[in-house]
Amino acid sequence: TDIVKALYDRGMKIIDLSADYRLHNPEDYGKWYGWEHPHPDYLAKSTFGVPELHREEIKKSQLVSCPGCMAVTSMLALNPLIKNDLIDTDHIIVDSKIGSSGAGAGAGTSHAMRAGVIRPYKPAKHRHTGEIEQELSQTAGKKIKVAMSPHAVDVVRGILCTNHTFLKKDIDEKDLWKIYRSEYSEERFIRLIRDKEGLHKFPDPKFLVGSNFCDIGFDLDRENNRLIALSASDNLMKGAAGSAIQNMNVMSGFDEFEGIMYSPLTPV
């Protein structure tokens, strides 16, 4: 936090990959991180770095805080539903699966213990929940509640978010596609996924590794009035370095897609 403050005071443009300036309410750092922010006045100076949601603000910002990997993957699927007042905002459940690289580059559990797992971690109060709630609440103009439970799975990179929501009103599939297309048709890093059969019926992070894309799809559970919004990304690209470069390009007036418009590394 001190380094960012010092650079900001010198007038430098900053892309921050840490979580230190993602949340705008100082009290949220106590809730989600268990510490008091040393520079609360600077939180309001930071822009949350998702160009698909905040492109114009990022263009003018001096400090952009890149989002958490699971947070950005989930909120890109949920935001159009909140924006169009389609779902119950008190009952949103995010079930996330993430590869081992989501734990960072430091030494950790040995391969023998990590390989082959489907392991829940932080099933309640994961810190990325605060980012999702913050951004969706801003869209809704009211407080949004999100329950998030992440799981470590046996891949190196990739995120799949299964976002369980409950409809406030009846809507058919065609109208849902229209809403998503209206929101993202001009966004080159968002791909809407739905095949009637085969391996590509829904988003799959296997087909995103090495790219800055976020794939979004959905399914309807009419019996339970449930809309399942599905989103996938590469946590090291859209969830980290790719977003940082995309934000830098927007801040600097460069071509937004410079350096990151790569096809996924498939097959791996």
Annotate the PLM regions.
Residues 1-123, 141, 219-222, 257-258, ...:
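N-terminal Rossmann-like NAD(P) cofactor-binding subdomain of oxidoreductases
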Residues 76, 80, 131-135, 179, ...:
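Alpha-helical scaffold segments in soluble metabolic enzymes
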Residues 90-96, 100-229:
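C-terminal substrate-binding/catalytic lobe of Rossmann-fold NAD(P)-dependent oxidoreductases
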